[in-house]
Amino acid sequence: MTMAGQTINDRLLAARHSLAGQGLAKSVCKATTEECIGPKKKHLDYLVHCTNEPNVSIPHLANLLIERSQNANWVVVYKSLITTHHLMAYGNERFMQYLASSNSTFNLSSFLDKGTVQDGGMGVPGGRMGYDMSPFIRRYAKYLNEKSLSYRAMAFDFCKVKRGKEEGSLRSMNAEKLLKTLPVLQAQLDALLEFDCQSNDLSNGVINMSFMLLFRDLIRLFACYNDGIINLLEKYFDMNKKHARDALDLYKKFLVRMDRVGEFLKVAENVGIDKGDIPDLTKAPSSLLDALEQHLATLEGRKVSAANTPTQSSSSAFGTAAASSKFDTTNGIDEQLKAQVLAEEEAAMNQYKSKVSSPTSSGAAGASAALTNPFLSSPPAAQAGQPIVDLFGAASAQPAAAAAATKASDDLLQLGNPFADMFDASGGGAAAVGATGNAGDGTAKYDGGAGSSPFDWGATDDDGGAAQ
């Protein structure tokens, strides 16, 4: 039997608290009646006001709500959880601090209401019976407990911290603290997503109100989560191996949670929440994850497979469009680009070889290089009529025959300047190096004229002209 929407039990309990002068207990009772609607705004506003009053006992208020959650009726239990959640979100922080520091939590992991099976659920047509609401009560209580544990671990509420690029708490956090903070945030977000209701489950005013509070928390939690991940990626390439491994694992978990958040937001859109209040979740490109994995593999000294290795190294998590366009995620490295890179490497190697070691057909240049090499055990005999500038010899006036008879490596430990005599000579570059090759062979040529530097080299191009 009900009177003006309230049951006889509700009215008797309120009267008892009034006679005992327990105004706070009466307000809690009014907010958690057996009527299958959400707690009334006037009762919630009064309780929020009580949390800001210095003469109101916060522990007493919290214990009254926890006591109401032990009721056998699912509506009373659910409304006590909703009232607690509302005070966490809009009440004074003292209320949250007490729940975080107290061992008094909602012990509803095995809650099951088998008694409320009347038609329509407390007189509401189309409502769900208590047996079907029990799983959502258990999940909701678990989330509120996790919310309290998060505050205990971090000393702040993720749903109330500043967000954004300029003043965001997680955007300005250092890497070490960030790696400890994000797992706590992930645990709270997981507990929220485990509520896992569908549109057809939101069939009465009680569960609808809890869903709106969860939706509010989800938007703020994910915004905070996103700030933390952005900060993590900005610091990723400066981390050591251990931190980089943890950061990559956190980013992979973030990608999984993005899909689950998207499913929750679809339910919110289906039940009529304004699309302007629902954020648009844009996923990062898959190349970002590839770049992070490649960097970690580099730190660990592992080889990265060709299919996952970009052709250009990136010092940032966000590669340029040019680099990403050259990377084919399905077929590995583009064959044309691969051939081009191999050709460039081969050309560079040939040019290097032509400078270091001349072929046997280069004539005087080959003989000159062999004669002046101090590391040869038996230098070849000098060819007559070819003056050689021996940079490793003791003096420029030494004959070629004497240089051939004495090993040049025997003179390496002398402390004299081997270049002094060459630059003191009156000819000023009288000896010329005849290293001129055929046109188009890419070899070097020096004129050796007076007034020109012995290091003024030019490269002969294909047309026979000197390229500057």
UniProtKB/Swiss-Prot annotation:
GO terms for molecular function: 1-phosphatidylinositol binding; clathrin binding; clathrin heavy chain binding; phosphatidylinositol-4,5-bisphosphate binding; SNARE binding. One of its GO terms (biological process) is chemical synaptic transmission. Residues 16-158 form the ENTH domain. In embryos, expression is seen in central and peripheral nervous systems (brain and ventral nerve cord) and Garland cells. Coexpressed with clathrin at presynaptic boutons of neuromuscular junctions. PROSITE patterns: ENTH. It is found in: Membrane, Clathrin-coated pit; Golgi apparatus; Cytoplasmic vesicle, Clathrin-coated vesicle. The keyword Membrane applies. Residues 438-468 are annotated as: Disordered. GO terms for cellular component: clathrin-coated pit; clathrin-coated vesicle; extrinsic component of presynaptic endocytic zone membrane; Golgi apparatus; synaptic vesicle. Disulfide bonds: none annotated. Keywords: Coated pit, Cytoplasmic vesicle, Endocytosis, Golgi apparatus, Membrane. Assembly protein recruiting clathrin and adaptor protein complex 2 (AP2) to cell membranes at sites of coated-pit formation and clathrin-vesicle assembly. May be required to determine the amount of membrane to be recycled, possibly by regulating the size of the clathrin cage. Involved in AP2-dependent clathrin-mediated endocytosis at the neuromuscular junction. Binds clathrin and phosphatidylinositol 4,5-bisphosphate. This is Phosphatidylinositol-binding clathrin assembly protein LAP. It comes from Drosophila melanogaster (Fruit fly). The gene is lap.
